[in-house]
């Protein structure tokens, strides 16, 4: 089963790389990660999701999101208790390729459909503002929004990161900004 998943992920990633199509909203050729790191991040996300689904009831696993950027794994979503939160982090840290786990899971009930729609709107607003600003490499920033909290991931220069963070802080609907950038200068 794991081999089948690996082949499927690799096939999709390879097809995307050949045409430089968009993946997760960003063209692969505009990413500061290498093609290998990009594929590795997709594999990490699949492995994390599978570990959650193999361990927790489907209702719990479906409320845990895994986002990997340059082998740093961000966990967001809602879990029913602290023990589940800790177990999810342990499972994520057990993925060999992962360098760092950012456990941003909250102990609460699942968010509403309206909250999810609001998060999508906030993400769109953030990405639009980042892409409009010519001093920020908006295509190189991964944006994740959960319950109004915006998480920023990417490989940026410090000045780019400072500007991007300020843009996001001043975007409608953003309640908090969590900066997870890695600096390249």
Regions flagged by a language model, labelled:
Residues 2-185:
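N-terminal targeting leaders
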């Amino acid at each position: 089963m794991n081999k089948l998943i690996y082949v499927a992920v690799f096939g999709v990633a390879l097809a995307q790389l050949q045409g430089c199509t968009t993946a997760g909203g960003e063209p692969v050729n505009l990413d500061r990660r290498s093609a290998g790191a990009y594929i590795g991040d997709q594999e990490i996300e699949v492995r994390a999701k599978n570990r959650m689904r193999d361990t927790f009831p489907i209702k719990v696993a479906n409320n845990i999101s895994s986002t990997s950027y340059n082998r740093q794994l961000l966990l967001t979503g809602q879990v029913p208790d602290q023990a589940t939160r800790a177990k999810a982090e342990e499972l994520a840290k057990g993925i060999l390729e992962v360098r760092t786990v950012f456990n941003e899971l909250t102990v609460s009930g699942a968010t509403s459909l309206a909250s999810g729609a609001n998060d999508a709107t906030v993400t769109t607003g953030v990405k639009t503002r980042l892409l409009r600003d010519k001093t920020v490499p908006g295509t190189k920033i991964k944006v994740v929004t959960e319950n109004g909290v915006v998480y920023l991931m990417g490989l940026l220069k410090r000045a780019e990161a400072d500007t991007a963070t300020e843009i996001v802080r001043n975007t409608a609907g953003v309640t908090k900004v969590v900066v997870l950038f890695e600096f390249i200068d």
